[in-house]
Amino acid sequence: MLQYPQIDPVALRIGPLAIHWYGLMYLIGFALVYALGRRRITSGHTTSMTVRDLEDLIFYSVLGVVLGGRLGYVLFYKPAYYLANPLEIFYLWEGGMSFHGGLIGVIVVMLLFAHKKRLGFFTVSDFIAPLIPLGLAAGRLGNFINGELWGRPTDVPWAMVFPQSGDGLPRHPSQLYELGLEGIVLFALLWWYSSKPRAAGQVSAMFLMGYGAFRFLVEFTREPDNFLGLLAAGLSMGQWLSIPMVLAGAGLYLFTARPPSR
């Protein structure tokens, strides 16, 4: 068993201001997306997007992630609770975000952005898709530092006891699994795959399939939310939300891979 490195969730204090690691990781995540996107633009990888376009897209995507992530959590995970306590929807400092909701928020942002800039939707989504995984990796590192979203009990040699779980049981460090698979591995695959010209929509399709598949697998080691538990077929909410991602990605890939009709 490995020792869980208990880290103060507050990264920096400036007078009364406390900067938490989790918020800092969000900032680092968006900074990584910007740096990688800027590199691709300035290297001539794309001629459809400018650096100013990237800056605008990231700014609005922050809103999409926060609003979509919060509303997704409210609707997917605790609708009855927030229906009874609607004002708590705005208590963002108490946590409660959904990746799948954040993804929907970003998709809406990309649709509006593409329309405003008169670009094809897949021109935008194929450009941004390979940049997202490292941002996700930063977020999962924030989860690990906070000691939240821990895994299920296990006896594997690298199990850790997360103090916040309250039961003292060794558990999978599932946040690190997600960091590795949904973050680093998915980034490497998409960066390589998108380095060559692809049909419009195929890079986006690979992101949907890759993230959905990795998240589905990791959920087998992640402790289900205690207020939900496992759902139909013994699957978690995260798995049920990931299945449509994989199916949509596969359908999009097959559709865009068709030879043009004559």
UniProtKB/Swiss-Prot annotation:
Q: What is its main location?
A: membrane
EC numbers on record: 2.5.1.145
Q: Which GO terms describe its molecular function?
A: phosphatidylglycerol-prolipoprotein diacylglyceryl transferase activity
Where does the protein end up? Cell inner membrane
Q: Which GO terms describe its cellular component?
A: plasma membrane
Keywords associated with the record: Cell inner membrane, Cell membrane, Membrane, Transferase, Transmembrane, Transmembrane helix
Q: What is this protein called?
A: Phosphatidylglycerol--prolipoprotein diacylglyceryl transferase
Identify the species of origin: Bordetella parapertussis (strain 12822 / ATCC BAA-587 / NCTC 13253)
